[in-house]
Amino acid sequence: MKLDLKSNTRMLRERLKTEKNALLRKNISTVIRHIESEIANDVDMTMSTLVAEPSIRSYFSSLAGRYEPNQGSQVREHESYMSVDGAVAVRGMYDMVCEKKLVWSHFDVHNLVVDTHCIVQSGLFHVPTTGAALKELGRSVDDEAAYYLGIGNFVVMFPFDEKSGLLLREDIYVDPATYQGAEKRKIKQGDYSPNYEKIVELAVE
């Protein structure tokens, strides 16, 4: 398997090709734009897909050890719940994760549910994580600057505001064992798909 950023929206784009319902097509396009603007490190475009005061909720947070909304809080590997609420806090989170490219992950989507009020994706998440981040979690690594691969099950829900058609929030459910053994999975250049950093497509209907 090659790490591939296009994996994150591949099933959504395939569904968009066949979906006839106008509202569902709009919802799919909004989620594609949201995900791909994250990957493109475009905070303004990411925020444009959200309501005025959005939230990000993460259960067994994939961001534990890499983003802590409460300044000075102790890093914990298996953070059971994290909530980032309001435009200022959510933008601050995206500024950080986009700067560090923390959303540059490979998501093998196994299930996709598209409804008028919510889109759900589930599958296997492959998360490139720095040695420095793993060290914060108490792992022993031979190179803090190198990237290591976390692997775990992942579910993400995108609920919509019915009036605006924008995303109310993002609800993320992460396998708490995602980083177990990650220090043994050091990523090599050959593990990435060709042009890994240049394949983001923001153009959607």
Residue ranges and their predicted role:
Residues V43-A133:
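A solvent-exposed, acidic/Ser-Thr-rich amphipathic alpha-helical stretch
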Residues F107-L112, N153-P159:
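Hydrophobic/aromatic beta-strand elements that line small-molecule binding cavities or substrate pockets
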Residues M1-A52, V200-E205:
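Short, low-complexity N-terminal intrinsically disordered segments enriched in polar/charged residues
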Residues L50, F160-D161:
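Hydrophobic alpha-helical segments, especially N-terminal targeting/anchoring helices
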Residues K2-L16, G138-G152, L166-E205:
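Low-complexity, intrinsically disordered terminal/linker segments enriched in charged
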Residues D115, D161-K163:
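Structural motif
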